[in-house]
Amino acid sequence: MLKELGAIPTRGRIVVDRNRITGGGVTAGIDFGLKLVALLKSRVYAEAVQLYLEYDPQPPFNAGSPEKAQPLARQFLKDMFAGMRANALATAKRAMQRLGA
């Protein structure tokens, strides 16, 4: 949907773009925080925070991105969210029209 709204989608969990930092995915919040600590303090500081949190993710399945998930799982989600995606896209397009974008 990002492409349809004029954005440039990327696969990065954390993306630094000029003065903006964004994170995607449910667990990316911790990754985002650690990256921010590294940028503001240092890598060693961020690693110490990671160690303190004992943040050592080991997901039980290797399906955390479209490239890694099996086709059946991708199609399952696509079908599940088809209506929501259509509504969200229509809402975003109406908002863009109101803003003159």
Regions found by a protein language model. Give the residues of each.
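Active-site-adjacent pocket-lining segments in enzyme domains
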Residues: M1-A101
